[in-house]
């Protein structure tokens, strides 16, 4: 199994350093690693500042990240609880992402997302969701699902869930 195991990691995901484009591949598969090295030497050249920032991130103690992790866990739990309380909505609890995929009681989430932006508002507010079909490689998957990021403050997430609940009660497929 060792020759078939590949670990891929990046500082952009691990340390929320979007755009840094620095990562690693670890495997005992020598052929894979040789091919990866050829590709890396021919095509990749991360900016110097990203390299310096990445090295600093690797040396940062875990305690620095604990507060942020706690905040995102709280946001996640708030969003999931709110979505689970909406009739017809199904959602799995993410374990490491800053977003969730929610199945909605709609036929086409793309149409619903567009309707939210063009035709729905409560007190001049609406909510924006990303149709999930674009995140699947299999055509037809995720048609009634949306991706919702929990990068907002907890209070804003609560309001967004209430808006989504109201929108679903008004929406006609």
Q: For the regions a protein language model found, what residue spans apply to each?
A:
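PLP-dependent class I/II
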Residues: 1-173
């Amino acid at each position: 199994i060792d020759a078939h195991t590949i670990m891929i990691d990046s500082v952009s995901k691990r340390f929320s350093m979007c755009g840094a484009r620095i990562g690693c591949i670890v495997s005992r598969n020598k052929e894979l690693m040789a091919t990866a090295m050829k590709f890396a030497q021919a095509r990749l050249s991360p900016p110097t500042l990203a390299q310096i920032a990445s090295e600093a991130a690797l040396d940062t103690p875990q305690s620095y990240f604990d507060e942020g992790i706690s905040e995102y866990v709280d946001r996640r739990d708030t969003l999931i609880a709110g979505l689970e309380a909406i009739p017809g909505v199904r959602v799995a609890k993410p374990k490491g992402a800053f977003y969730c995929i929610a199945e909605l009681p709609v036929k086409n989430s793309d149409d619903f997302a567009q309707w939210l932006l063009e035709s729905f508002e409560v007190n001049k507010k609406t909510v924006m969701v990303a149709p999930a079909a674009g995140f699947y490689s299999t055509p037809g998957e995720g048609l009634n699902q949306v991706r919702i990021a929990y990068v907002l403050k907890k209070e804003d997430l609560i309001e967004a869930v209430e808006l989504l609940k109201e929108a679903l009660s008004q929406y006609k497929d």
